[in-house]
Amino acid sequence: MDFQHRPGGKTGSGGVASSSESNRDRRERLRQLALETIDINKDPYFMKNHLGSYECKLCLTLHNNEGSYLAHTQGKKHQTNLARRAAKEAKEAPAQPAPEKVKVEVKKFVKIGRPGYKVTKQRDTEMGQQSLLFQIDYPEIAEGVMPRHRFMSAYEQRIEPPDRRWQYLLMAAEPYETIAFKVPSREIDKAEGKFWTHWNRETKQFFLQFHFKMEKPPAPPSLPAGPPGVKRPPPPLMNGLPPRPPLPDALPPPPPGGLPLPPMPPTGPAPSGPPGPPQMPPPAPGVHPPAPVVHPPTSGVHPPAPGVHPPAPVVHPPTSGVHPPAPGVHPPAPGVHPPAPGVHPPAPGVHPPAPGVHPPAPGVHPPAPGVHPPAPGVHPPPSAGVHPQAPGVHPPAPAVHPQAPGVHPPAPGIHPQAPGVHPQPPPGVHPAAPGVHPQPPGVHPTPMPPMLRPPLPSDGPGNMPPPPPGN
């Protein structure tokens, strides 16, 4: 066969296959695929005759190879014969009886009525769990019969319209009628001891009890109030620490500026009548009490009425380096300054220095050139925020207001005394108040300029120096 001169053929290669060759190759390929999925040895219509060819007993066809038979089985003729044979066999085959269903024999008895019952509602005292106890009387129950029960949904019964809020508990025993109890549709607690039944054969009584599950946890029981005078137990510890003690009802607020705390108010009943003057502690022996410090009127305060003498201005001692007189030492007379520390007084017969000339105190620098010393009898202004006090003398309260109209300030040399305490000064010597220079009788003090005004209590004792040590 000439494969080289065919149309489409190439020199050195095989020629184009004919249609018969293509069909043979296709049938072989299909046979291999069919053998992989179909086992012809199990086909009831496949048969190989004595000539070596294959026959189809259903269609009575002859095939030379297995591929031809497999192709026949997928054809229309073979499939039609299969359907015709199946219909014929189904028609000729005898009808087999259907499998019998299990039938429940219904017991037939004469009903004698409804049994007696008793329902008890119960509630657990500890947990607060609700339960129901049923007692059913079956005095005429049949021999060998035990009462039975079951829960039925509202959708199973046909007596009432279905309501999902309710369910039914059925009780049955021959020859009595079946009775049902309508209970709330809540979940039943089937735990041990929560659901139980009992049949008493002697009294012919049937008992059933069940509990509903708790929907919400019970609230903690409150402690009962004990009799008056009996203290309740302390609360439990929080994180292992005891509770904080209760604070007093009326605690005064802390004073501003670091001042000492005021005394606590009395807890007893308030005394009747007008309030008296504030009680001051008695002074120490040899120490004269200070005169009441009266501040000049600030802005917004009306001046005193005509004929009323203004209070004496508070004049503080010089700046640091000059200490106030020690306790028990009386200040000098008006216009005479005390000697500085470490300077002895002049001996008898020695004249003092001229008026207006003061010896320099230790630690006080001389004035710079061009600075004139103060005139005799004129004291330098106090430094800002310096309020020295003598040891043992309490500072005045920061809430002392100017005197009312018609009240004269104390005369120079007269000091108020604490109630019940009368210190005796030396005869003929009248001590002056600390920081206040007395004025001769009949001479009124001149008002102080605003620049020399003493600091107000609102300025705070931030720059107050400590008191000097006692000698």
From Swiss-Prot:
<feature type="zinc finger region" description="Matrin-type">
    <location>
        <begin position="54"/>
        <end position="84"/>
    </location>
</feature>
<dbReference type="GO" id="GO:0008270">
    <property type="term" value="F:zinc ion binding"/>
</dbReference>
<keyword id="KW-0747">Spliceosome</keyword>
<dbReference type="GO" id="GO:0000398">
    <property type="term" value="P:mRNA splicing, via spliceosome"/>
</dbReference>
<keyword id="KW-0007">Acetylation</keyword>
<protein>
    <recommendedName>
        <fullName>Splicing factor 3A subunit 2</fullName>
    </recommendedName>
</protein>
<dbReference type="GO" id="GO:0005684">
    <property type="term" value="C:U2-type spliceosomal complex"/>
</dbReference>
<keyword id="KW-0479">Metal-binding</keyword>
<feature type="compositionally biased region" description="Pro residues">
    <location>
        <begin position="217"/>
        <end position="295"/>
    </location>
</feature>
<dbReference type="InterPro" id="IPR003604">
    <property type="entry name" value="Matrin/U1-like-C_Znf_C2H2"/>
</dbReference>
<keyword id="KW-0862">Zinc</keyword>
<dbReference type="GO" id="GO:0071005">
    <property type="term" value="C:U2-type precatalytic spliceosome"/>
</dbReference>
<dbReference type="InterPro" id="IPR013087">
    <property type="entry name" value="Znf_C2H2_type"/>
</dbReference>
<dbReference type="GO" id="GO:0071013">
    <property type="term" value="C:catalytic step 2 spliceosome"/>
</dbReference>
<dbReference type="GO" id="GO:0005686">
    <property type="term" value="C:U2 snRNP"/>
</dbReference>
<keyword id="KW-0507">mRNA processing</keyword>
<comment type="similarity">
    <text>Belongs to the SF3A2 family.</text>
</comment>
<feature type="compositionally biased region" description="Pro residues">
    <location>
        <begin position="437"/>
        <end position="471"/>
    </location>
</feature>
<feature type="region of interest" description="Disordered">
    <location>
        <begin position="217"/>
        <end position="471"/>
    </location>
</feature>
<keyword id="KW-0597">Phosphoprotein</keyword>
<feature type="modified residue" description="N-acetylmethionine">
    <location>
        <position position="1"/>
    </location>
</feature>
<dbReference type="GO" id="GO:0003676">
    <property type="term" value="F:nucleic acid binding"/>
</dbReference>
<dbReference type="GO" id="GO:0005681">
    <property type="term" value="C:spliceosomal complex"/>
</dbReference>
<dbReference type="InterPro" id="IPR052092">
    <property type="entry name" value="SF3A2"/>
</dbReference>
<dbReference type="GO" id="GO:0016607">
    <property type="term" value="C:nuclear speck"/>
</dbReference>
<dbReference type="InterPro" id="IPR000690">
    <property type="entry name" value="Matrin/U1-C_Znf_C2H2"/>
</dbReference>
<feature type="region of interest" description="Disordered">
    <location>
        <begin position="1"/>
        <end position="27"/>
    </location>
</feature>
<dbReference type="InterPro" id="IPR036236">
    <property type="entry name" value="Znf_C2H2_sf"/>
</dbReference>
<comment type="function">
    <text>Component of the 17S U2 SnRNP complex of the spliceosome, a large ribonucleoprotein complex that removes introns from transcribed pre-mRNAs. The 17S U2 SnRNP complex (1) directly participates in early spliceosome assembly and (2) mediates recognition of the intron branch site during pre-mRNA splicing by promoting the selection of the pre-mRNA branch-site adenosine, the nucleophile for the first step of splicing.</text>
</comment>
<feature type="modified residue" description="N6-acetyllysine">
    <location>
        <position position="10"/>
    </location>
</feature>
<keyword id="KW-0677">Repeat</keyword>
<dbReference type="GO" id="GO:0000245">
    <property type="term" value="P:spliceosomal complex assembly"/>
</dbReference>
<comment type="subunit">
    <text>Component of the 17S U2 SnRNP complex, a ribonucleoprotein complex that contains small nuclear RNA (snRNA) U2 and a number of specific proteins. Part of the SF3A subcomplex of the 17S U2 SnRNP complex which is composed of three subunits; SF3A3/SAP61, SF3A2/SAP62 and SF3A1/SAP114. SF3A associates with the splicing factor SF3B and a 12S RNA unit to form the mature 17S U2 small nuclear ribonucleoprotein complex (17S U2 snRNP). Identified in the spliceosome 'E' complex, a precursor of the spliceosome 'A' complex. Identified in the spliceosome 'A' and 'B' complexes.</text>
</comment>
<feature type="compositionally biased region" description="Pro residues">
    <location>
        <begin position="303"/>
        <end position="316"/>
    </location>
</feature>
<dbReference type="GO" id="GO:1903241">
    <property type="term" value="P:U2-type prespliceosome assembly"/>
</dbReference>
<feature type="modified residue" description="Phosphoserine">
    <location>
        <position position="153"/>
    </location>
</feature>
<dbReference type="InterPro" id="IPR031781">
    <property type="entry name" value="SF3A2_dom"/>
</dbReference>
<dbReference type="Pfam" id="PF16835">
    <property type="entry name" value="SF3A2"/>
</dbReference>
<keyword id="KW-0863">Zinc-finger</keyword>
<dbReference type="GO" id="GO:0006397">
    <property type="term" value="P:mRNA processing"/>
</dbReference>
<dbReference type="GO" id="GO:0071004">
    <property type="term" value="C:U2-type prespliceosome"/>
</dbReference>
<dbReference type="GO" id="GO:0010976">
    <property type="term" value="P:positive regulation of neuron projection development"/>
</dbReference>
